[in-house]
Amino acid sequence: MKEMNAELVCGILDEIMEYELAGVVRYTHSAMMVSGPYRIPIVAFLKEQAAESLTHAQQAGELIVGLDGHPSQRIAKINETHRHSIKDILEESLEHELHALSLYKKLLGKVADRSIYLEEYARGLIGQEEQHSLELKAMLKDFG
């Protein structure tokens, strides 16, 4: 196995943690703003995404500590578009998931062949983010 740069990996994990924490805020806000006939199932979906983002942030933070790093107390910047139609919310959610996917792929690039545990962690989260992206794309089909 190759040598792993723990400081670099902690930096990426910190970026992931901050982005996932921003996801908690984004999804919670979005859930509050949904209106219309599909409100109930979409609010439930968004609340589930917020809870999952919190879990992902906590996991990343625990890994940072395990690697002798120190998790930040920041969250990533959240862009407020003031567009709150269901289509807009789902499109912004898809954009969020795709960026999260890119962060986990970035992590995978730095831990592959260096740490089996971190490689499997990254692969698992990549799978989850890909699944969420596919779900959102399917939900957006009705909005043409």
Report each predicted region and the residues it spans:
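Iron-associated oxidoreductase/ferritin-like identity signal
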Residues: 1-144
